[in-house]
């Protein structure tokens, strides 16, 4: 199986959104906040599309393809990346994310994402030449076939070529954590995230020196 790695084209944005939505539909990061599958699907499609539009050209979107089909996608932010302003998100249609879904569910998820990503952002800003992977997905039917590990190796080369010395990311899945550790990332922070129903979700932040 030949894998082609590259940079996402603007005309491929919707394809990346659809891929990520399929992969994220069973991820604790979303299922805990959007228990209804129909609402979860709607939010995932809308949220990722609007975020992609807002961030396009401001960060690094990487892909892996097999026979021309996109099978993996990642957003990797360099140390100079600045999150777009609220106005920029609004101008790219962010308010449409709330259309037809429970506003509280979206706001609870956004609050969780800020808290869960904080250790990585703090670590990135405290050091130098550290890149942050804010999103990574592999097409479900292509998981456990070695594509994810090869995709990470591609990021590492991509980051090194641009002067990066470390990468960091977080996950809320034990399965994903085991995968990242197998690929050389080490835990530097772990904490519980309080869920709206009073339960807790574990969050692990990991890093790797390149």
Where are these regions (language model features)?
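Conserved N-terminal entry element of GNAT/NAT acetyltransferase domains
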Residues: 1-14, 22
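Conserved beta-hairpin
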Residues: 58-74
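Conserved acyl-donor/pantetheine-binding loop and adjacent beta-alpha core of acyl/acetyltransferases
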Residues: 75-135, 194-197
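Conserved GNAT acetyl-CoA-binding A-motif
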Residues: 130-131, 159-172
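Conserved beta-strand-loop-alpha-helix junction that forms the acyl-donor binding cleft
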Residues: 134-143, 168-178, 196-197, 207
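Conserved acetyl-CoA-binding loop-helix of GNAT-fold acetyltransferases
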Residues: 138, 144-157, 182
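Conserved active-site alpha-helix within GNAT-family acetyltransferase domains
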Residues: 149, 161, 173-190
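Conserved catalytic-core motifs of GNAT/GCN5-like acyltransferases
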Residues: 168, 186-204
